[in-house]
Amino acid sequence: MSDTNNPGDKTQTRAPSKPLTLKRPVEQGTVRQSFSHGRSKSVVVETVKRRTIGAAPGTVAPREPVAAPPPRPASVAPAPAAPARPAGRSASGVVLRTLSEQERDARAAALADAQRREAEARARAEAEVKARRDREEAERREREAAEARRREEEERRRQEDELRRKAAEDSRRRAEEEAARAAAAAPVDEAPAEAPAAPAPVAEAAPTVAPTPAPAPRPAPAPARPAAAAPAARPGAAPQRPAASGARPGVAGARPAPTAARPAAPQAPAEPRRTITADVKKPRDLNFMARPAPAPEPEKAPSPTTAARPAGTAARPAARPGAAAAEDESDTKRVIRRPGMPLKIITPPKTPKSPGGDRNRGRLTIANATAGEDERTRSVASFRRRQQRMSGHRHEEPKEKIARDVTIPETITIQELANRMSERAVDVIRLLMKQGQIHKITDVIDSDTAQLIAEEMGHTVRRVAESDVEEGLTSDEPDLEEDLEPRPPVVTIMGHVDHGKTSLLDAIRRANVVEGEAGGITQHIGAYQVAAPSGDLITFIDTPGHAAFTSMRARGAKVTDIVVIVVAADDGVMPQTIEAIQHAKAAGVPMIIAINKIDKADANPQRVRTELLQHDIQVESMGGETLEFEVSAKTGDGLPELLEGLQLQAEIMNLRANEKRDGEGTVIEAQLDRGRGPVATVLVQRGTLFTGDIIVAGAEWGRIRALIDDTGKHIPYAGPSVPVEVLGFNGTPDAGDRVIVVPNEARAREVTEYRARIKRERLNARTGGANRSLVDMMREAKEGANRKELPIIIKGDVQGSVEAINGALTALGNDEVGVRILLSGVGGITESDITLANASKAVVIGFNVRAHKEARNAAERDGTEIRYYSIIYDLVDDIKATLSGMLPPTLREERLGEAQILQIFDVSKVGKIAGCRVMEGVVQRGAHVRLLRNDVVIHEGKLAQLKRLKDDAKEVTAGYECGMSFQNYQDMRVGDFIECFNVEEIKRTL
């Protein structure tokens, strides 16, 4: 919108797009502001001289400020031409009344906006406090509180919508009233002023200003203002132009002469201060802080300057573009009128707010400090501190409880339990203290206690066991009938030592294993396959018969199908024979009795049958069901019949297996070979083992590198009932471990790590590991103070032999002496073994193994003893003799005689000497003596001197008198008896 000026018009013309600039006398200075944390900033301060503006003529009712209405045009009648301007201008001819009124309106609107924004900020803060209280209440009733917040939000929105709607109605009504007043006040150059209208009602729910009277029509312009009352001319303003010759009738010539005196207009009453509520307050923007804001003035009808404007000149708009830009977007619509055009209501364009427009609303300037409109608003630093405090309160808000699914193993530490629940460990310890338990965060609790704690804290518990890693490792599903095929029987030969078990097996295999065994006794468990006369294969397992190999015999009975009990015809049933019978009964396998050595002259097979009846074994020849065969390993008599009986028993048992499934078996024996590494003798029981399979045996795993049968040949696979040597384990497994094929290495590592951990825990529990309390250690130290121990390190050739040695040596000893095995393993003696033995003063025992060169050198340097054995008998006997030498001897007293004290003599440099008479027996010098007083032992020691008269005597017999003195004792009295005796030491044995 632009102004069209006639040649006679001297008013200022401005483009709407240019901002309003005022050239004032300005003084500048600097002020240093201090902020928190030692920060400061220099600020340029402008000092502007305050301009005094005279009061407007006429009595005008104050304007009623309302909320910003939505744009809505109003239809009004066109306004007549403005009357001629009176002579009320300044010496420079600049019109200032309209400009100052617009400026005051803009500043009043800016103040209202600032107060409204500040009120909204306070309302938001109050809403945040209320929301925080609601969240605290929502800990117990979360759903109800959430529903309440939702209803509250809906109510607040509804109220805001209602406020906006009513504010829009008020604004529309006000705009219509202003338009009507503007239309009525156009031809008022000589019309009398109308009475003020009644006050307009205020909307019910609108939180706006207090009710004020509605504006009345402006009165007729006054004749003239005094020259002294004219405000200073605005710099840069154009002089007022004279009226054009083509003015409308009644308008031209209506302007009085500039020098004509005009009666002074009545002074306008002071505008009542508007009461700004919380909803209309907003922070001040930059336009307000740039210059001092005048007090808001009441609205007026079109000024005489505008009314008296000559015809042909477009009427000045009611709101200048520069002033409109300074007003908030909530201002009411403007009413403008152009010559020859209908009256229009124009809504000023909305100025978009910049993101940081309100950032500097609290900056201190001279103009801001001297304005006096309102108290100084909050600074940026203060606002930031308030935001930080609010954010800190939000951080202190209690977090909502989150129920989690907690997985609890069999044992768990308090710290780990707290981490899984996302709780504090101190809270867990506090709950345990309520239950009467005192713990640290590193203590281990059981699964029941952990479940109780987790449920107490509102979590869901899912209990698992560490052994779950072994689930699915073996399949218990029965095999299909079409997959089952006959397999060879597994026969275990058991019996007493030297009853001919290995010789019998050699005769069947046509081999000579006995000569290869040290001492002619079996110290390893062996597995072989033999072809029966019918051509079928039979798998034999040879077990030791020595008492130390009980565990070997038990393993052999568990993996077998048939047990052959070998009994010598000349010895009969012996202790290990009875033990073998018990193992077979415990395993639930059928037994066959082989009566060996029938070729001897003193053989008595019938005595063997009779002795077996004492152990509930009735052979067929005596009406029972147990098969018995008389055989001779030396001559080979009865061996074919024995093999036929084994084949018949296998057919009765209908032994079948599935070769198509993954292989499973049992470790019969294991050893550490220096060239091949860990080697395990495995008996395959189900499925088939292939080269390259990943297998797990106890706490060891590996990939099969090679399969070797009993004849030493490499085979690609091994089926059911086939004994093979397996190479490829990463460690030596224990004899009796289950061998299982797993799909991948990850699964193998998972299983073996769990088993190794369980193995360590059991070892610590058995030897007293880290879980022992101080009381336990003190009790054990007290109990073991008088017990002597022999530390030993054992290295053997195979796992079974080492196990047998451990069992035999552990059984030795009593409460006074015993064996403490520091280390036992398979393989040669290494330098680390010597180092351990030197540190603990232990003896190193090698069973069928030798020490490495480095180990020998270290043993010679440190003086460590290494003993080599190949027969378990010799090893056990030597250790037993060593323990016997550690036993304290038995003391036995031999009474010599008795004497009575008759007189006490004091001898210088000697002390007291007792004059005695030997009552019975003999008293010897250097013998042990015991002083008795009233049949109570007063002292026990040794005789220091023995004299007969004045000569030293070796002994004094009964009836003679002598003098005696004791070692380190002088309290002797007349009438005491002295008993003389000798102490004899007797060597003890285990």
UniProtKB/Swiss-Prot annotation:
Region (G5): 632-634
Biased composition (Pro residues): 210-224
Subcellular location: Cytoplasm
Region (G1): 495-502
Pfam families, A to Z: EF-G_D2, GTP_EFTU, IF-2, IF2_assoc, IF2_N
GO MF entries: GTP binding; GTPase activity; translation initiation factor activity
Residue spans of biased composition, Acidic residues class: 467-483
Chain intervals with Low complexity compositional bias: 74-92, 181-209, 225-270, 302-325
Domain tr-type G: 486-656
Biased composition annotated in UniProt, kind: Basic and acidic residues: 114-180, 271-285
Compositionally biased intervals (Polar residues): 1-15
InterPro entries for this protein: EF-G-like_DII, IF2_assoc_dom_bac, IF2_II, IF2_N, P-loop_NTPase, Small_GTP-bd, T_Tr_GTP-bd_dom, TF_IF2_bacterial-like
NCBIfam families linked: IF-2 (TIGR00487), small_GTP (TIGR00231)
Family membership noted in the UniProt record: Belongs to the TRAFAC class translation factor GTPase superfamily. Classic translation factor GTPase family. IF-2 subfamily.
Protein name, per record: Translation initiation factor IF-2
Gene name of this polypeptide: infB
